[in-house]
């Protein structure tokens, strides 16, 4: 069965806050909800656009909104699945489309918040139909990767799908796994299924995306370091130890490849000393932020707000108020 390619005409209004890790998205979103509530405006419900927040039991390392924040403002697409499972961009797009309709049906406004840019892209631009993920096939691929290593599977992919293999690093486990899975299920290379002719989503022109982007890379890097210091103080290592103790997780799962969890797992495996954990997590997050900003630059409809300049919340509220007035 192909993955869902949701198109929802007529598309309803939506507001989104995107940006790299540590840019202040959560604070800005909560500020909008509180601002409109104080002014007698429409209630807000937040739709998480974050591939790490879907996992249960992964709270500290994902900077999951607190129980108090989630009680104050309804949040969706958080704690959806166990960390043994997977959640695709196509599933997100379908769930977001459904939730936007339900939120409008309750007389509220949907606010999409997050930094998983692939989710935004698939939801806004559509996606080619692809085979649904198969847990059995993935387990077989993971087992072979443990025996042979991902570079060997990358070489195998190069034989059956050289176009996809050429754009993937030999250690890009998640994407190599998906490409081999598609090949095994369909008998067709993933590159032949990415036609670029998928129908554009009806959502693309019905809302406003505010993108919080720094003018100073050093500012963002400092925020990232401070964020991980706080996570370590809050018990990130204990959280990963608890996940390891379950006995049903391994480091090749998408959940355990999340930034922070992967590095902590490797440290607990003795691959390098605990004194290096903060810098390794911070470095991986800096690379993630760089990729997020690259994705954002390819989204011409976004409105950029400098997140490292004074008055960010006020500027966000001004743009949100103007959008809300036009969306009535």
Curated annotation (Swiss-Prot):
Domain of life of the organism encoding this protein: Bacteria
Residues that bind substrate: 21-26
Cofactor: Mg(2+)
Pfam families, sorted: IPPT (PF01715)
Entry binding sites for ATP: 19-26
Keyword Transport attached: no
Keyword annotations of the record: ATP-binding, Magnesium, Nucleotide-binding, Transferase, tRNA processing
GO molecular function: ATP binding; tRNA dimethylallyltransferase activity
A biological process term (GO) from this entry: tRNA modification
EC number in record: 2.5.1.75
Region span, Interaction with substrate tRNA: 50-53, 174-178, 257-262
Site feature location: Interaction with substrate tRNA: 116, 138
Known partners and oligomeric status: Monomer.
NCBIfam families: miaA (TIGR00174)
Family note: Belongs to the IPP transferase family.
Protein name as annotated: tRNA dimethylallyltransferase
Organism: Leptothrix cholodnii (strain ATCC 51168 / LMG 8142 / SP-6) (Leptothrix discophora (strain SP-6))
Gene: miaA
